[in-house]
């Protein structure tokens, strides 16, 4: 969160807190239980949302019979999610919702002082809940390091009495460790989630479908018992499609008569790439992360134990270390997958390599209503062929030096005839004109080359920024999205039905 964002957040929260306080002042409160504590703020000392560096939400899942404990914490590098190996959190909106709830939240009226009524009001502490528990609330806690700034157990909702505003929804709530249950006015309660997907930037590729220029499908199966790629990869199909001006084309499909590209399917592919959302993540081994940040998966691998650790991690997700023979008896290592890969080329020269791994069945399976999810290995790289190389203008040769005619008798000691003044003047004019042409061509070419080099440097920088985010993680995507982007020829090539002859055009 930038300083400007923090400032705007603080100002917005101050206004929200004031509005809530005004709405919950004494008018109409006499229709709620009044114990003399009504109208007081729960957390009078908690006024600065920027003071919190830890947010904890605990919610009881009755179906699973266990509490879901979700935590977001901040460091100098930003907000992260400890439960998911410190994956970066996109927490601004969520934090605003939570802080808006707890800053200035007022006790509208006391409902009960009886600990035995907590179940009835739905404010049982989820941290103490056990399988079979009911009436359990949602615990929201903001803290600074080990110091709790504000915490509240939010229970059942109910319609506000007519004296307040019957269109508003109120909640029962209490502070952990205290028996009193109060009615409170809280907003955005349903938006406070313990689900990983609600706290991260879902568009993790940061890919704009309007910048897609080329898609290459490399569909293959991998025999993990083999290590040499020429033996291990069973090629199913390789297809390259270009996209420009709203149309798809391909020069290597060799389509038969009646075949054409299915624009709807390919447009859905572009949409799916743009909407490629995370379901879960798992961290890669540090050897692999460090190497990827330098442009190659095996850049920093120095010994066999490191390579074995990487290979073991990859294999568990459906990715493998393949070997490609190189000149001089050398071997190049390469990451491959058991479900092929797709390369997405962008207008700026960046290419995404997306490799598809094994089916994933993890703790976020309830997020994926369409069925099994799948591991995805994503890396960015530069593809210079995506950028149009500059067409340089030929630079003309300089005018050769003016020739001096030899002496008539060939005697080297004879005086050299004086050059013709008119010829010399004409030569100088041509020489200067040519020099101007040369300078203009060189300057134009230099400008074109600089513009091209700037694009290359920008692409390299973009690749570095993307891999800094992508390198540490195995991603998990939904099976529904996987089916939209993992296409074979039969999926995006359609066959037109032959036109049946009618009585008017039937052969005679």
State each model region's role.
Residues 1-508:
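Secondary-structure "cap/kink" motif recognition
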